[in-house]
Amino acid sequence: MSKDVRQLLDKTYGGNPLSREEAKCLFASLVRGELDEVTIAALLMALKVRGETIDEISGAADAMREAANSFPRPALDGGILDIVGTGGDGFNTINISTTATFVAAAAGANVAKHGNRSVSSKSGSSDLLGQFGIELTMAPQTAANCLEALGICFLFAPHYHGGVKHAVPVRQKLATRTLFNVLGPLINPSHPDFMLLGVYSETLVRPIAEVLCALGVKRAMVVHGEGLDEVALHGTTQVCELRNGELVDYSLSPKDFGLEPVQVTELEGGSPEDNALITAAILKGEGKAAHRDAVALNAGCALYVAGLADTPQAGFKLAIDTLASGKAYEKLIGLAAMSQQDKA
């Protein structure tokens, strides 16, 4: 451990905020494996107890983005979109954001979905996609080929962020939320231009939008929907929208989209096998209305953020029409087939 890193740790332990560059230095040391487990635990808890600042979150994200395995981002008209949540909201819902990515892609967006295994549900994005035969550890060039040909790819977080492994045992033993809970959505190796990002707490909505602005994201909606890290079908969603470098706070309700609220229990998921059946039904234009509407709400807001709809409501209508066409399911089948090309 260098003298500079030791001084930064002491500064953190003293309750003093770090600059963005200082936070980057500390977390670069972490992902290089230079900090032992006790030090990592002390760092994460010192930040948690005081409360992480915008600069600290941004600096940690800078370090992890810089250390990531590179993704050969293709030159695409219209930019790249990600639909992602922090997880950790405590609800075991169906895979709303993951399912919404296929709808957005079928409606014309280029979606690079960055995900991992489950945090709060029984089935995270990679758990679900594996059920459809999608090769999670596809080579970066294969993922880029999928994005260019199909308008969608999946980037499995551990495949790109090997340095995070140094914090895994500590996070498991601490068994409490830390900075790493919000870092995942911020370190997509495709560096998306547009994001619909759900957070597990309303208090994170504006701060994370400020971080996205600092990281250079062009347009985004950061959302929290009455307990869920999604746009809510069961109640009011708090939104902070990033547009042209400015942040605007507002709320959305199901009635804004011509929908009646449902009970959150109607969105409960199950095992990866159960959720795969639900996702397939939704993408084929079948299944429960509540499932369809929850996915279309999130896909619609993402299409709005990506500039493919003038309003969230117009995005919702486009998503509903896309689901009815069955084209979203075709995207899923296409990704499953193309992701396997490394094995051919």
From Swiss-Prot:
GO terms for molecular function: anthranilate phosphoribosyltransferase activity; magnesium ion binding. One of its GO terms (cellular component) is cytosol. It comes from the Bacteria. Pathway: Amino-acid biosynthesis; L-tryptophan biosynthesis; L-tryptophan from chorismate: step 2/5. Keywords: Amino-acid biosynthesis, Aromatic amino acid biosynthesis, Glycosyltransferase, Magnesium, Metal-binding, Transferase, Tryptophan biosynthesis. The keyword Transferase applies. Its cofactor is Mg(2+). The keyword rRNA processing does not apply. Anthranilate 2 binds at residue 171. Gene3D superfamilies: Nucleoside phosphorylase/phosphoribosyltransferase catalytic domain, Transferase, Pyrimidine Nucleoside Phosphorylase, Chain C. 5-phospho-alpha-D-ribose 1-diphosphate binds at residues 85, 88-89, 93, 95-98, 113-121, 125. Belongs to the anthranilate phosphoribosyltransferase family. Catalyzes the transfer of the phosphoribosyl group of 5-phosphorylribose-1-pyrophosphate (PRPP) to anthranilate to yield N-(5'-phosphoribosyl)-anthranilate (PRA). This is Anthranilate phosphoribosyltransferase.
